[in-house]
Amino acid sequence: MFADKLRPFLDRYNEISALLGDPNIINDIEKMTKLSKEQSSIEPIKNAASQYLQTLDDIEENKALLDDAELGELAREELKSAQIRKEELENEIKILLLPKDPNDDKNIFLEIRAGTGGDEAALFVGDLFNAYIRYADLRGYKFEIVSQSEGSAGGFKEIILLIKGKGAYSRLKFEGGTHRVQRVPETESQGRVHTSAVTVAIMPEVEDSEIEINPNDLRIDVMRSSGHGGQSVNTTDSAVRITHIPTGLVVTNQDGKSQHKNKEAAMKVLKARLYEMQEAERIAKETSERKSQVGTGDRSGRIRTYNFPQNRISDHRINLTLYRLDAIMAGGLFDEIIEPLIAHHQAEAITDAGL
């Protein structure tokens, strides 16, 4: 019975409450801190579980009144409401019981790179960049450009952002993959629709303690910074390129005002990429028997199509199609794509966990 799975959480919460009132514990700051953190982590489950158990009682009480001449009709209405509430609470609790992604609350590096399609791909990188920063702004996140390479006709060949805010990774982690765009270029006189593609990578910002890099595995090159079109923008060798020799990963940064700043920014991106690579390998092992693009954040496959003539956006992982592309690209309705992706992932995780 589902209720039986909840009682250990209620018992543990009450046990911790009693321990936190114990004078011996109060004088032990380390134990107090550990118990307080555990209690905080259990509290949402405890609150939902208490409501769930109360709802079960309400259901039984109303069932007992169904044949009552005076209260039967009211009991029938109350029973229906309680049964709906029971289902809602069950789903809420199942989500709370899922193992938390340790990266969910982290800041992210968001990398958008032009793929096939030349100038059109670079222009769409710019469009996606604008959509993401509008969404970040609406969510109250802060962002900064870590590095950028402008396209010859506008937009960007590549741009990397650091988006800061609690839950940034949890909201945007399913954006990684190939995004295909279909639209008529401004230079197209025949009105033909062109198809181009960009790739997006979402990488959690990592602490130094989370990933170790052997300095001997790095090759660091410094060079003259260059601006749009390749012209020199200063007289010092401030641009930095870092190569991680074992993996072949290369990160270049020249947007900072000093070599030190550029090296620091490049190292942060390199660590995020290496961490993402390690996480992808770990997840691939854990989910080898269950192929789920949403669950694994697979970057290799086409995840979404943006069709401008039809004002249509389609996410191929969950068979979702919306005809509000203009509003979604404006950032305000981005959650209409993100929320179903999160719900799909949670539903799969609940099934896998046997809840």
Swiss-Prot record:
Residues 283-303 are annotated as: Disordered. It holds the Pfam family PCRF. GO terms for molecular function: translation release factor activity, codon specific. It comes from the Bacteria. SMART domains: PCRF. Keywords: Cytoplasm, Methylation, Protein biosynthesis. The gene is prfA. It comes from Campylobacter curvus (strain 525.92). The modification N5-methylglutamine is found at Q231. It is found in: Cytoplasm. Transmembrane segments: none annotated. Methylated by PrmC. Methylation increases the termination efficiency of RF1. Peptide chain release factor 1 directs the termination of translation in response to the peptide chain termination codons UAG and UAA. InterPro entries: PCRF, Pep_chain_release_fac_I, Pep_chain_release_fac_I_sf, Prokaryotic/Mito_RF, RF-1. This is Peptide chain release factor 1. Belongs to the prokaryotic/mitochondrial release factor family. One of its GO terms (cellular component) is cytoplasm. Gene3D superfamilies: 3.30.160.20, 3.30.70.1660, 6.10.140.1950. Residues 283-292 have a biased composition (Basic and acidic residues).
